[in-house]
């Protein structure tokens, strides 16, 4: 047995499923998950000593690559001054100044510890601000594991949501309406059925949890217009896309102004950090200035703030996003060419430093239904064959891939060459 196999066997006796987040268990592709010993730049190194070109990037945060010296040094220096104070620090102010400077739609920001905390807090704030209970989310979009968000669509287009996890009360789920991504008609229908009850829409501007689905040109502006028409707030969940699709996020890339924005992943530079913010009048409703309660013992802790500040300072440098786009475009085009040579039907979506690989005969993949029609079994074989080639992709047909500026063009070309060999045998 490999060392990863031995560790996984031991882990399953002590940790549910052997992992601390389900997708890491390789249940979407089968086999034994890799146990990682270290990471540097664009590479992961497992406990058995094998190196992999990494396109998971810790599920998005590692836009600068692993073990970036500026972030590492910032963490070391901050740790020398103390790990957590439970009191305000200067770095929290500096971090808030930087975030609101980089994302102009955020007049104010509140730091939290994860993307889930950011989205659940933003939704609570939207409900408190509007005095309404219902929310709209989209089928196939993931916004963390808060009860109100673990909801699937009912049997009809306008039915109330149903829990998709045991432990979520039906009374919670009924306040969540699930619409179809990239389908404005389904959103209007929900508003027309509940015109005075919907507090907010929450949306991934690029859906990264049904692989990578960009919005149609009219979709995000249409959501903004519907929120304005019916008096709801628009929450854009930029946990994946923030500082990755563009410096000011996908909202800037696509030209839409939200009322609230949720951030995570890159904002922490690899540390557990989330944030939400937006319009000043909405944020003023948050405790202690307003009645909507939100708190956290470790929110804004000095280690996380130092890492996040160092990361965002580097990400804001000229050329970062042009490099991400160039590398991702080259990878997408190369994979398509290699698949075509092997007569394998493939669609590759990409936006900025995000990409998605779909085995499908369809010309495009634009929504959850399109994703579910793809060949998942072929993806599973592709994943394991690429892993054997030393390329680490997301172990699920429903998760986006992530590029970093630490990837070199040689890394990209080597990945394409590996895919060409795999496609020939797939």
Swiss-Prot record:
Its cofactor is pyridoxal 5'-phosphate. GO terms for molecular function: glutamate-1-semialdehyde 2,1-aminomutase activity; pyridoxal phosphate binding; transaminase activity. Its EC number is 5.4.3.8. Signal peptide: none annotated. It is an enzyme of class 5 (isomerase). The keyword Cell division does not apply. The keyword Isomerase applies. Keywords: Cytoplasm, Isomerase, Porphyrin biosynthesis, Pyridoxal phosphate. The modification N6-(pyridoxal phosphate)lysine is found at residue 265. SUPFAM superfamilies: PLP-dependent transferases. Coiled coil: none annotated. Pathway: Porphyrin-containing compound metabolism; protoporphyrin-IX biosynthesis; 5-aminolevulinate from L-glutamyl-tRNA(Glu): step 2/2. Pfam families: Aminotran_3. InterPro entries: 4pyrrol_synth_GluAld_NH2Trfase, Aminotrans_3, Aminotrans_3_PPA_site, PyrdxlP-dep_Trfase, PyrdxlP-dep_Trfase_major, PyrdxlP-dep_Trfase_small. It catalyses: (S)-4-amino-5-oxopentanoate = 5-aminolevulinate. It is found in: Cytoplasm. One of its GO terms (cellular component) is cytoplasm. It comes from the Bacteria. GO terms for biological process: protoporphyrinogen IX biosynthetic process. Homodimer. Belongs to the class-III pyridoxal-phosphate-dependent aminotransferase family. HemL subfamily. This is Glutamate-1-semialdehyde 2,1-aminomutase.
């Amino acid at each position: 047995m490999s060392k990863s196999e031995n560790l996984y066997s031991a882990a399953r006796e002590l940790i549910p499923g052997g992992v601390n987040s389900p997708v890491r268990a390789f249940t979407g592709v089968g086999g034994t998950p890799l146990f990682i010993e270290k990471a540097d730049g664009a590479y992961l190194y497992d406990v058995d000593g094998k190196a992999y070109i990494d396109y998971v990037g810790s599920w998005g945060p590692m836009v600068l690559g692993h073990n970036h010296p500026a972030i590492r040094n910032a963490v070391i220096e901050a740790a020398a001054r103390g790990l957590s104070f439970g009191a305000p620090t200067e770095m929290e102010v500096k971090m808030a100044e930087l975030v609101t400077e980089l994302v102009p739609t955020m007049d104010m920001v509140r730091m939290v510890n994860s993307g889930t905390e950011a989205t659940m807090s933003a939704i609570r704030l939207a409900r408190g601000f509007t005095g309404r209970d219902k929310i709209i989310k989209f089928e196939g979009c993931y916004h963390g594991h808060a009860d109100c968000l673990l909801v699937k669509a009912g049997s009809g287009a306008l039915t109330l949501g149903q829990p998709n996890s045991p432990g979520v009360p039906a009374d919670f789920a009924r306040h969540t309406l699930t619409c179809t991504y990239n389908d404005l008609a389904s959103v209007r229908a929900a508003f027309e059925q509940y015109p005075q009850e919907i507090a907010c829409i929450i949306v991934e501007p690029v859906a990264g949890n049904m692989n990578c689905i960009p919005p149609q040109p009219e979709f995000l502006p249409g959501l903004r217009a519907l929120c304005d028409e019916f008096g709801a707030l628009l929450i854009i969940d930029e946990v994946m896309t923030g500082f990755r699709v563009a410096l000011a996020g996908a909202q800037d890339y696509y030209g839409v102004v939200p009322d609230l924005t949720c951030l995570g992943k890159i904002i922490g530079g690899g540390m557990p950090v989330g944030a939400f913010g937006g319009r000043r009048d909405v944020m003023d409703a948050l405790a202690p200035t307003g009645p909507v309660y939100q708190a956290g013992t470790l929110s804004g802790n000095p280690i996380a703030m130092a890492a996040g500040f160092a990361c965002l300072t580097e990400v804001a440098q000229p050329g970062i996003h042009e490099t991400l786009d160039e590398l991702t475009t080259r990878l997408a085009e190369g994979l398509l060419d290699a698949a075509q040579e092997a007569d394998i039907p493939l669609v590759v979506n990409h936006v900025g430093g995000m990409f998605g690989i779909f085995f499908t005969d369809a010309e495009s993949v634009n929504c959850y239904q399109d994703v579910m029609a793809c060949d998942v079994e072929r993806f599973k074989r592709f994943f394991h064959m690429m892993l054997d080639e030393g390329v680490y992709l997301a172990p699920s047909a429903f998760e986006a891939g992530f590029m970093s500026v630490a990837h070199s063009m040689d890394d990209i070309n080597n990945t394409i060459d590996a895919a060409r060999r795999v496609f020939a045998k797939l």
